[in-house]
Amino acid sequence: MTQSKRAEALAEHYVDQLASWAHISTRPLFGACGLYRQGHVFAMVWQGALYFKVDDDSRLAYVAAQSHTLGYVSNGEQHALKSYWEVPADVVEDRETLCLWAERAYQIALQGGKH
């Protein structure tokens, strides 16, 4: 199974986890899989992990949880998407908290105005 297919399968798991919060769709996104609500990407699944969109305020909770940005290698160089941070394991494991963090990420995506 390719990295992209693994990401899509895991993304579907998160769609199920977030079903009580909102209708979520998924689409491949540069080898990852984007999670969308009403056309706005607010999360990505990449290399077996879930990443939510952050802003300066929400990033503090991720830093406190010792999380990290979505990192990747391109042309042999390390890069990071600083606007996406890995969702901490304790959040992923608690559906109610996961939905709260997803709502925050979605609100941040709305502020960005990007589809």
Annotated model-derived regions:
Residues M1-H115:
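Charge-dense, helix-prone N-terminal extensions
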